[in-house]
Every structure is written in C-alpha cells, then in structure tokens.
C-alpha cells in the first residue's frame, strides 16, 4: 500500500518519505522535551538529525551546512531551512553550500546555546536535569503548543512540498 518493495521511483519515494521525512516528523512530535548536543560538522543529513530536537546545544567549533544543491537537489529531505534559519539565510546557505557557525545559528534562533567543547556535555546534562524537574504535563503542553503554532503556519505542508521537489532531483 505504501509503495515499499515496489520497483523504481515508487519504492524509492516510499522509502525516503518514511525514512527521512516520516522519522524526523515523529521525532519532532515526541511528547517529551528532546535535546541534542552538537560538535564538529553537521552536514546535510546531519541537519535532519538535529532539527527535530527541541533544544540544540552546540560547541563553539560546530558548523552547519547543506551543500546538496551542488548535486542537483533542493536540499535535504526534511527541508526545515527557512523555519530554522529564516528565508534569506536559508537561500544563502543552499545557494552557496557554505557552512554557518554555531554563533551564527544561535543568532538566527536555530541553536539555543553555544559552549566550549569541554563544557558541552556538562552544560547539556545540567540543562536536561533542570528541565526534567518540571511537571511533565506542563512540558508536554508547552511543547505541543509551540509545535501547533508551527503547524498552523504551514510547516508540515511545506516539508511535504519540498520533499516532492527533492525527488525531482533524483
């Protein structure tokens, strides 16, 4: 029914839609707060692994890029670029393939905190423990409220539309 196991584009599309877009969407909607710590380079598919998280803590040496326009596609399958860094910066990021620094991403709202690599784990764990002490229902409702605001702004249909265009580049 979903196209898995089908030959050609039908099977390929079903696989990528589920593996890339579907999993990222489900991670985004986990009813508990999620955090990720990032160091080094986050390239293309790496963005899809961090963008669904609620809080991103990056080391000072972290760099974020999506150079896949050079391969003839619009960007990674979970096309969160305009939502994560804004429209103009998303275009620059995609058109040039150049990396954004952790500090740039913090200024754009994509990264919550930038710390030294030595402090990364301790800082992230301290914040996670602080959040874990909050009432679970309040956390769930707060996360759901923010996610629903993005949904009302059209995040999901935008991701689906970009995914369709991404397949044209294959």
Where are these regions (language model features)?
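C-terminal long alpha-helix characteristic of the crotonase
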Residues: 57-62, 111-160
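Glycine- (often His-adjacent) and acidic-residue-rich active-site loop
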Residues: 1-22
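Short alpha-helical scaffolding segments that buttress acidic/His motifs in well-ordered protein cores
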Residues: 93-94, 142-145, 162, 166
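Short, structured loop/turn "capping" segments at alpha-beta junctions
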Residues: 87-91, 100-107, 135-139
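CoA-thioester-processing core
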Residues: 22-29, 37, 43-94, 123, ...
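N-terminal glycine-rich phosphate-binding loop for ADP-containing cofactors
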Residues: 53, 155-169
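Well-ordered beta-strand positions
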Residues: 54-55, 92, 96-98, 104, ...
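Terminal peptide-recognition signature
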Residues: 33, 50, 105, 142
């Amino acid at each position: 029914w979903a196209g898995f196991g089908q030959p050609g584009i039908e099977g390929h599309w079903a696989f990528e839609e589920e593996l890339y877009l579907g999993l990222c969407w489900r991670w985004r909607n986990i009813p508990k707060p999620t955090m990720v710590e990032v160091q080094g380079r986050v390239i293309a598919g790496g963005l899809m692994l961090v963008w669904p998280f609620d809080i991103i803590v990056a080391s000072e040496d972290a760099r974020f890029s999506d150079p896949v326009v050079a391969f003839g596609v619009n960007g990674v399958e979970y096309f969160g670029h305009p939502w994560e860094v804004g429209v103009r910066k998303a275009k620059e990021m995609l058109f040039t393939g150049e990396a954004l620094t952790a500090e740039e991403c913090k200024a754009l709202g994509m990264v919550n905190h930038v710390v030294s690599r030595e402090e990364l784990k301790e800082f992230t764990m301290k914040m996670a423990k602080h959040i874990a002490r909050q009432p679970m229902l309040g956390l769930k409702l707060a996360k759901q409220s923010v996610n629903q605001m993005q949904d009302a702004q059209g995040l999901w249909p935008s991701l689906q539309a970009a995914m369709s265009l991404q397949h044209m580049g294959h």
